Amino acid sequence: MDIDHVEFILEGVKLSFYSSPKYSPVKGAIHCLHNLFVADIKSIAAMKMEVMMRRSNFRDYYDIYSILKAGVPIQEVIALALEYSGHRLKTKNLLAMLTNGARFTRDAHFEQLAPIYQVTAQEIETYIKDCLIL
């Protein structure tokens, strides 16, 4: 890891964070344990969307789905992701990534993450499209 990338395992869940040197979407850190603070849920979703510029991991797509299922408004997360990327990420490109489930294939180790939802990339795509319509 580098100074701008850290990983933790908390209660069996691997948390990995990358910090852009110029931008941070975190508006309010949440105290977790001792001197450990974590990003708020909207910021996590924004970081997940931003990292999709560099990788197409199913777990990122799934995480975005889970966050949206928890009631976080997609429009707010999209705006935050665009800001976080320094506007290198464009709305049109982000929407194209989010609404193309074919980009995301479930890796062999995904089940080790003990997902709450049994959902396919196609089902996530449909859900995201529905969220965008509302």
Predicted regions span which residues?
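Compositionally biased terminal segments of proteins
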Residues: M1-L134
